[in-house]
Regions:
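Twin-arginine (Tat) signal peptide motif
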Residues: 2-21
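Bacterial N-terminal signal peptides
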Residues: 19-32
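Pepsin/retropepsin-fold aspartyl endopeptidases
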Residues: 2, 34-343
Length: 343
């Protein structure tokens, strides 16, 4: 069965992940053993009391998180598979290791982080946390600031997500990224989040335009073999997942008849059966990602996004991690990609 204000460049760690299962980190109720977890090293000992929730904050009732629970995780600087960890400061404390998740509408943290910040969760407001395999009602905390690089979010409401992140301490979602530029250098394990100045791509980069919905999902037009496909760029997921409409379209071209059974399990413990298939290259712009393995399943999130009638795919870090450099410019609505050199 199957990520202090002013930091502009910082290291990230990727976890090696094998297999196609292990799916969403959306929403498991807190288990009673979380308080025994070891808190990260943080500075000042005194923590101000949590801020009261405003009327607007109380209206927040639903949050999307797309990061998936890994099967196997081992920090590595060599393998191009795994999620991106960004060092994030919360209320000036940290840094905490949050997974950069372009499939998440909001950031979230584990109960261990809430404990380290000294913020109780037992009587906090709840939100509906939605993920790949299901949804659940979870508590929230409100903090003063969340910052990394040029990204600074004031008074964010953070859902408490399960401590099943393979060593990460939460999710860095897309709120606050509307005018930002994310630079990810896989070859040197570097990430920078800065204000976008509308820079054009370099001569050795390929530009791929994207569109986004209200939740800031990154949506591009792609081809999987001969099939036109709507693709979601999902830096929070280790693996690539296709819907059944894409599976059926490939089958019409006699592609993918020799898959093997797979299971997708989210942090809600909901399990959905899937089929792991070696597919033709995934192409977008002039980029081609070869040796693609896609798990096809009728997962909850495709239904929630109303992406069941036409071919759709969530491109995870097993594919994105094969790139040399990935730039996501939210102001330009453009990805700028440099492929890794072969050999």
């Amino acid at each position: 069965m199957n990520r202090s204000t002013g930091i502009e460049s910082c290291s990230f760690t990727r976890g090696l992940v094998r297999g196609a299962g292990g799916l969403l980190l959306a929403a498991l109720g807190l288990s009673p053993h979380w308080a025994a977890a070891t808190a990260p090293t943080v500075s000042p000992p005194a923590v101000p009391p949590p801020l009261p929730l405003s009327d607007a904050a109380e209206q927040l009732t639903e949050i999307m998180v797309e990061a998936r629970e890994p099967r196997y995780v081992a920090p590595t600087r060599r393998d191009q598979i795994g999620r991106i960890w960004a060092p994030v400061f919360i209320n000036g404390r940290g840094p905490f290791r949050l997974v950069l998740d372009t499939g998440a509408s909001n950031s979230g943290v584990t109960a261990m982080v809430a404990l380290a910040l000294g913020i109780p969760t037992d009587q906090s407001p709840h939100v509906m946390l939605r993920g790949v395999t299901g949804s659940a009602d979870v508590p929230t905390i409100r903090v003063d600031t969340l910052s990394v690089g040029d990204l600074a979010v004031d008074s964010p409401i953070l859902p408490i997500i399960p401590d099943a992140l393979g060593g990460a301490q939460g999710i860095l979602g897309s709120e606050g990224l509307v005018n930002k530029r994310i630079f990810i250098d896989f070859s040197h394990d570097k990430i920078a989040i800065t204000y976008s100045r509308g820079e054009r791509s370099g001569h050795d980069f390929v530009s791929v335009p994207f569109r986004s919905n209200r939740g800031q999902l990154i949506i591009i037009d792609a081809m999987v073999g001969p099939v036109r496909t709507k693709a979601i760029i999902d830096t929070g997921g280790q693996t690539t997942i296709g819907n059944l409409a894409l599976r059926q379209a490939l089958a019409q071209h006699n592609i993918g008849f020799h898959g093997k059974p797979d299971q997708i399990q989210g942090a809600t413990l909901a399990v959905e059966s899937g089929e792991l298939i070696a597919t033709p290259p995934i192409k977008f712009g002039t980029i081609a990602i070869n040796d693609s393995g896609v798990t096809f399943a009728d997962v909850y999130i495709f239904k929630h996004w109303k992406m069941t009638s036409e071919p759709a795919i969530m491109i995870g870090m097993d594919a994105l991690g094969t790139l040399d450099t990935l730039i996501i410019d939210y102001r330009r609505h453009e990805m700028q990609i440099r492929m890794a050199k072969s050999g």
